[in-house]
Amino acid sequence: MQQWSSKVTNRVWVMGDAVVDLIPEGELHYLRCPGGAPANVAVGVARLGGESAFIGRVGADPFGRFMAGTLASEGVDTRHLIQDPAHRTSTVLVELDAEGERSFTFMVRPSADQFLTPVDLPVFQAGQWLLTCSIALANEPVRSSCLQAMAAIKAAGGRVCFDPNLRPEVWGNPAEMPPVVREAIAQADVVKLSLEELQLLSGLDDLAAGLATISGPALVLVTRGAAGV
C-alpha cells in the first residue's frame, strides 16, 4: 500500500469536481467515464511521476465509489476526497455535434462537490501547488472553501494555478460568475484560460486589451484553438 505524507514539498493539491461523464456509445448506450478537469489534472500529475492529492466531495453512491477508486488506482492521494451521504456525485451527459465539438449537460445540481467546507481542507506546506477551477467557486460552501484554500497555500509559501473552465449552468446565480472568478484570478500565480473566457471576463474582444485587465498572476496562458497558446 502506498504511503502518503501531506508534508511533501512538491505535492500538487487539486481541488474541485470529480465527475462521471456519460458518453454516447452507439444509439442506445452510454459509456461511464471518469472526468472533471481537476480530476484529470490529478491523474496527469500522478502519471508523470509527481505526487498529487485530490480535495473534494463525491456522493456515497456507485458513481462516487467509481471515481474514488479510479483516482486511487491512478496513484492519486484520495484521503481528502470525501464520500458525502447527503448529496450525489456530479454526473455529466456529453454530446458531440457534427464537427466533433462537445456540449455538456449537468445532470445533478447541486452535486456533492458544491458542499465542500473549510473543515475539509488539509494543512498546506511551503513549495506545494494548488490547482482549482471555477466550478469550485460556483456556490456556497465550496466557494468560501476554495478561496480560503487559495489564501492558505499562498500564506504557507505555496503557489496557485487557476483554470477558469467556465460553466455558467453550474452557478446558482450566473451573474456572480465574472466578479468571483476575477477575484480568484487575482490570487493565482498561474492562470490558463481560453480566448473566449478572457473575452467574457474582460468584456473586450481584443486579446492584448483583455490581458491588460488581469493583474496578480505571474503567468497567464490563453488558448486560442487552432491558433495555439
Which residues make up each language-model segment?
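Alpha-helical segments flanking ligand/cofactor-binding loops in enzyme cores
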Residues: 43, 69, 151, 182, ...
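Anion (oxyanion) recognition and catalysis
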Residues: 46, 72, 151-155, 185
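Glycine-rich phosphate/adenosyl-contacting loop at the front of the ribokinase-like
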Residues: 2-77
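Conserved phosphate/ATP/ADP-binding segment of small-molecule kinases
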Residues: 156, 170-229
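A short, histidine- and acid-enriched strand-loop-helix "catalytic/donor-clamping" loop
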Residues: 164-170
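Conserved N-terminal subdomain of the carbohydrate kinase-like
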Residues: 51-133
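Active-site metal-binding loops of divalent metal-dependent hydrolases
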Residues: 18, 135, 164
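Short beta-strand/loop segments at the ligand-binding rim of alpha/beta enzyme cores
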Residues: 157-164
